[in-house]
């Protein structure tokens, strides 16, 4: 039996978190795993989103009528659980109003549920797409202030998020900002940690891409990119292929706004402090909280935005109805809810990924490259991954890795097809090849015919022009040579020759036409 109680109702229960002034207490073991059959305690309301990791749903806990978010993962083999367990271990350490709360997990037959805070207004990336415009400076100030408070807490727990971006910063109906998605987060044991490349390309810090020692200030760099993203609508270099962007970030000067003059000097200064390339000179989250731009944040700056987002959310829900029937299981394959994504993000998210030994499995839409995998060519600007060169002109947003295409996302592989389906696929493949060969032959024949026809048309037009010219010249000669000056024999020769020439040319022209 799974329950959620108000504070003080049962001191023997385990306190999990305190979202929205409600203390969630549940019957769980020491690892916060819910008792068997816990999934029946929830009523799935709608599908909130879908990513490489799986899907997120809004659910109602029946006995308490509390809304929560369920992050569902498909499990196909034992090692699929490892990245999920890693995210859970990070979430278990967090109990802060600026970080998404973790309520527990449920392991089912072929899926895994993580139960978390429900932030009804979704991410700031989604809100920006819904309202169709970027945010005001006063709104950005408060968003960044609360995000910094979340980072201060995470860093105090020795947790580096490594994937800070607007899509991972959420907003609830009370105007509370929360950091989410710890799929590529890392628990560090020392001040510096040299490790793998992780995160989303446009938001990555240069020290990660250059594979030098880094610390928790990589999250500050990412937050600086978020500041530009919220102001300009997209991160710097968003028009560039992700792999090319990764090369450029490590070698170019720090980015800034598209038009810095549009923003206050305090805002520009804040971004400069975040995007200092020297990690030792870059400000920490605690220092940034004392920056004039952050200290100017008003507590009610998000009130108008929150109300607007609530109205848009309600309007959208009424127009499309619930995307998941309460009787359906969350992993129903018939449920689709495509989120609006900026065009630059579709490069990263709207493709299927293939597995690779050099790409780490994550529970987010981000990628982890193992240490010493990534290197750049200063001369060509190409990206080399285990001696495999990825072209700069690759517009698909994919990474060529040892002849495999790896998108910036990870997903468990589906079970292998049955023997019958393999045979069927082979037959279909043969038929397709035969059809392609037939189409190629038809195309070749048609092309040859068109070529010959074009040549004949050209010859015909030339003959036609020349025939008219010959006729004109012949008449001109006849007119200049009076027939009366010729004897009867020569007159006949001229006349018959002219008529014969005209007749031959006419027949020739008619044949080619």
UniProtKB/Swiss-Prot annotation:
EC number(s) given by UniProt: 2.7.11.1
Mode of membrane association: Single-pass membrane protein
Keywords for the protein's UniProt record, in alphabetical order: ATP-binding, Kinase, Magnesium, Membrane, Metal-binding, Nucleotide-binding, Serine/threonine-protein kinase, Transferase, Transmembrane, Transmembrane helix
Domain Protein kinase: 42-294
Cellular component GO terms held in the UniProt record: cytoplasm; membrane
Main location: membrane
Stated family: Belongs to the protein kinase superfamily. STE Ser/Thr protein kinase family. STE20 subfamily.
UniProt-annotated binding residues for ATP: 48-56, 71
Record field: transmembrane: 493-512
Catalytic residues identified in the record: 163 (proton acceptor)
Catalytic activity: L-seryl-[protein] + ATP = O-phospho-L-seryl-[protein] + ADP + H(+); L-threonyl-[protein] + ATP = O-phospho-L-threonyl-[protein] + ADP + H(+)
GO MF: ATP binding; metal ion binding; protein serine kinase activity; protein serine/threonine kinase activity
One record GO biological process: regulation of MAPK cascade
Cofactor(s) needed: Mg(2+)
Low complexity bias locations: 331-357
Pfam families, alphabetized: Pkinase (PF00069)
Protein's name in the database: Serine/threonine-protein kinase pakH
Compartment list: Membrane
Claim: Transport is one of the keywords in the record: no
Top enzyme category: transferase
Residues covered by region (Disordered): 313-358
The UniProt record lists the keyword Plastid: no
């Amino acid at each position: 039996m799974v329950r959620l109680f108000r504070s003080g109702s049962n001191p023997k229960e385990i306190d999990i978190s305190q979202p929205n002034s409600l203390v969630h207490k549940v019957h769980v073991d020491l690892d916060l795993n819910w008792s068997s059959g816990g999934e029946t305690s929830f009523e799935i309301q709608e599908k909130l989103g879908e990513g490489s990791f799986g899907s997120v749903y809004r659910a109602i806990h029946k006995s308490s009528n509390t809304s929560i978010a369920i992050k569902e993962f498909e499990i196909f083999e034992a090692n699929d659980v490892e990245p999920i367990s890693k995210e859970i271990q990070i979430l278990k350490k967090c109990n802060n109003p600026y970080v998404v709360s973790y309520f527990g997990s449920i392991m089912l037959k072929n899926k895994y549920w993580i139960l978390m805070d429900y932030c009804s207004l979704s991410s700031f990336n989604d809100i920006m797409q819904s309202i169709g415009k970027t945010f005001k400076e006063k709104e950005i100030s408060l968003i960044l202030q609360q995000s910094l408070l979340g980072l201060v807490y995470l860093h105090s727990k020795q947790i580096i998020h490594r994937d800070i971006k607007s899509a991972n910063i959420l907003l609830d109906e009370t105007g509370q900002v929360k950091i989410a998605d710890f799929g590529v987060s890392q628990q560090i044991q020392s001040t510096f940690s040299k490790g793998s490349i992780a995160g989303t390309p446009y938001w990555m810090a240069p020290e990660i891409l250059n594979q030098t020692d880094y610390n928790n200030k990589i999250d500050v760099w990412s937050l600086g990119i978020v500041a530009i993203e919220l102001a300009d609508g997209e991160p710097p270099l968003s028009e560039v292929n992700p792999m090319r962007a990764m090369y450029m970030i490590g070698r170019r000067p720090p980015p800034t706004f598209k038009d810095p003059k549009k923003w206050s000097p305090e805002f520009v200064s804040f971004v400069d402090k975040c995007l200092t390339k020297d990690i030792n000179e870059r400000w920490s989250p605690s220092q940034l909280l004392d920056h004039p731009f952050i200290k100017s944040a008003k507590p009610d700056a998000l009130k108008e935005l929150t109300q607007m987002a609530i109205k848009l959310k309600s309007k959208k829900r009424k127009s499309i109805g619930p995307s998941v029937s309460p009787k359906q299981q969350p992993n129903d394959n018939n449920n689709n809810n495509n989120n609006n994504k900026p065009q630059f993000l579709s490069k990263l998210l709207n493709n299927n990924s293939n597995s690779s030994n050099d790409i780490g499995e994550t529970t987010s839409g981000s990628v982890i490259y193992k240490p010493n995998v990534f290197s750049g060519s200063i001369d060509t600007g190409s990206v080399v991954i285990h001696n495999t060169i990825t072209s700069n002109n690759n517009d698909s947003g994919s990474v060529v890795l040892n002849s495999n295409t790896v998108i910036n996302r990870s997903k468990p592989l589906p079970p292998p097809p049955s023997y019958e389906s393999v045979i069927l696929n082979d037959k279909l493949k043969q038929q397709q090849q035969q059809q392609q060969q037939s189409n190629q032959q038809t195309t070749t024949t048609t092309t040859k015919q068109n070529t010959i026809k074009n040549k004949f048309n050209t010859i015909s037009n030339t003959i036609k022009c020349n025939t008219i010219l010959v006729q004109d010249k012949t008449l001109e000669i006849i007119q200049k040579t009076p027939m009366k000056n010729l004897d009867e024999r020569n007159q006949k020769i001229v006349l018959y020759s002219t008529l014969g020439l005209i007749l031959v040319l006419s027949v020739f022209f008619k044949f080619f036409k």
